[in-house]
Amino acid sequence: MIITALIAIAVGFLIGYLARKIIAESKIKSAENLARTILESAKRDAENKKRELLLEAKEEIHRMRTDLEKEIRDRRGELQRLEKRLLQKEETLDKRAETLEQKESFLEEKQKEIQQLEEQISLLYQKEIEELERISGLSREEAKAILLENVQKDIQHEMAVMIKEMENKAKEEAEMKAREIIGNAIQRCAADHAAETTVSVVTLPNDEMKGRIIGREGRNIRTIETLTGIDLIIDDTPEAVVISGFDPIRREVARIALEKLIEDGRIHPARIEEMVEKAKKEVDNMILKAGEEAAFEVGIHGLHPELIKLLGRLKFRTSYGQNVLKHSIEVAHLAGLMAYELGADALVAKRAGLLHDIGKAVDHEVEGPHVMIGAELAKRYHESDAVIHAIMAHHNDVEPQTVEAVLVQAADAISAARPGARREALEAYIKRLDKLEQIANSFEGVEKSYAIQAGREIRIMVKPEIVDDDDIVILARNISKKIEEEVEYPGQIKVTVIRETVAVDYAK
């Protein structure tokens, strides 16, 4: 039974093995057939692709050959055309060369004929000269000299007449043009002018205020006059006091300080000192504002701040009674208008016109003429050479070298010479007072000085650490002697030298 089972199992295994082998062989054969089919298909596709590529290559070769043949034909045609044109040019050149040869031969023949004619003319000319010399009894050189002399005289006379006519015409035209330019400039520049005075009037709320201004034993009025350098005139005029002084800046400081004191009501030396300092600062602001407004009115930009301050100070300076700042603005406008008419640099003319008297803002502090001082200030604050030259030339201290310098000079003369612009008497008076202060300030140890009482007195403040009580008598005598030598004045001048020592301490 067991053996039968084993045999059955063995037979089963054998049958299974044979079945698997048959199946495997069948799959292998199928795979081989498939591979063979794929390989044959690939060979057929490759052959087809090869034939297609060969056909395309043949077509491309044929196309390229056709294009090349066409290009060769075109090139040959172009070469043939060029050859034809070259042949035509050669023929043309040959014809021209032949024509030139003919012309050259013709010119040579004509040249020979001309030479023969020139020789004949030369012979005839020589014969004529010899005949003229024989008839006139003059040589050729002598006759030539006489002829040239006569011609020269005629030409010189005609030239002299012509030059004279041209000069007269030019002068007439220049004079007419100058009148027209100056007339237009004056018409377009309307400047107001008010005569400058040396007094200011301060209105009081009542006459009792006069006593408070004078103070106990006159200490308040003395303090005001000492600190400001002016004369305070208190008379019978109702509800008014008069501030007198030749320096407008000091007078303005005194006026503002006095008005502030009257408004405040507290009037004593300490308060006066405080108000005077405030007034000085306020006047400094007014000076700066006046300079800025002047530059803006004229249309000048880029001025150095120090020049603007100096311009503002000109508001408080006069020249023969004419306000120097208004005069400078007027000169700037006139010079600019005339420069526009002439086609010159109007900006340079206006700038130089505005700054031409800038030296007058400091001429009482610096020695030298205001022209040179102004030129030095302009140079210091980086003004252009053209502006500096115009400032230096406006009083002919140097010869004007530019049109703008001449225009500034002319505008200055127009502004100063017009009717009502200046008054000689006031200027001479102010110069005399200024001279008194300059003499006093020239001595060592003098801190400041003030000419008051219409020039009949000069008060001098000295530095106590330099000048002692014994020296002030000698100083007063020396100043008086120098005033007698250098200043012309009516009557007498009182010289007052003040030495004051103030000690301050604080209780803590």
From Swiss-Prot:
Residue ranges constituting the HD domain according to the UniProt record: 324-417
Molecular-function GO term, any one: RNA endonuclease activity
Transmembrane segments: 2-22
SUPFAM superfamilies: Eukaryotic type KH-domain (KH-domain type I), HD-domain/PDEase-like
InterPro entries: HD/PDEase_dom, HD_domain, HDIG_dom, KH_dom, KH_dom_type_1, KH_dom_type_1_sf, Ribonuclease_Y, RNase_Y_N
Main EC class the enzyme belongs to: hydrolase
KH domain residues: 198-261
EC code(s) of this entry: 3.1.-.-
Annotated Gene Ontology cellular component terms: plasma membrane
UniProt membrane topology term: Single-pass membrane protein
Keywords linked to the UniProt accession: Cell membrane, Endonuclease, Hydrolase, Membrane, Nuclease, RNA-binding, Transmembrane, Transmembrane helix
Top-level taxon: Bacteria
Pfam families hit by this protein: HD, KH_1, RNase_Y_N
GO biological process, one term: mRNA catabolic process
Main location: membrane
Locations listed in the record: Cell membrane
Protein family membership: Belongs to the RNase Y family.
Job description of the protein: Endoribonuclease that initiates mRNA decay.
UniProt protein name: Ribonuclease Y
Gene: rny
